[in-house]
Amino acid sequence: MNTFALKGTFLDTPAPDTLRVREGYLLCENGLCAGFSETAPAGVEVLDYTGKIITPGLVDLHLHAPQYSYCGTAMDLELLDWLQQYTYPEEAHYADPAYARLGYSYFVRDLKNSATTRACIFATLHTDATLELMHQLRGAGLSAFVGKLGMDRNSPDSYREPSAAAGLAETRRWLDTCRAGKMLSGWTGDRDN
């Protein structure tokens, strides 16, 4: 059993419109929060963060990693215009492994340095770039669900898969590679479910 306690100033919101600030110890057992105490638990290693604020991590349920480089831009455009002018041209660059590696390195670095501890992340339709993102997230110690996109219509030729069958084949290749690399927790290997 991996047990330790964090000592510090804890902030949380136990109810809407309620901010709680407490000094004390958070007992952690096997990666789970097991309890809070104002006194140090006996016989447990204490990691002392006195003077530091400790908060619950945030979960981002909808992130597009390849869009990170231009987030907050062109807010005057409607969605479809924004996709055509910004998103599709940028995401097409992720076919280049070196471009994907560099672009995702900025995204992963900044995500790691944020309060986000878990995320659901969209990559691109490029299998190898999607695997690169997953590799970087794992290397940074971040936990995420990552999705490979599939597109065979309603986007420019530079950013679409040649056909639905080709997209399915690439998605299977992505899943098989993830499974072989043990990147899918709980994956059963049943392609029909």
Question: Can you say where each PLM-predicted feature lies in the sequence?
Answer:
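N-terminal metal-binding scaffold of metallo-dependent hydrolase/deaminase domains
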Residues: 1-42, 52
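Short secondary-structure capping/turn micro-motifs that flank functional sites
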Residues: 7-8, 127-128, 153-154
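Domain-wide signal for the mature, well-folded portions of proteins, strongly enriched
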Residues: 9, 19-21, 49, 90-94, ...
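Divalent metal-coordination and catalytic microenvironments
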Residues: 9, 26, 31, 51, ...
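Active-site gating loops and adjacent loop-to-helix segments of metal-dependent hydrolytic enzymes
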Residues: 71-100, 153-165
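Divalent metal-binding segments
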Residues: 80-129
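Metal-coordinating catalytic core of metallo-dependent amide/deamination hydrolases
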Residues: 132-193
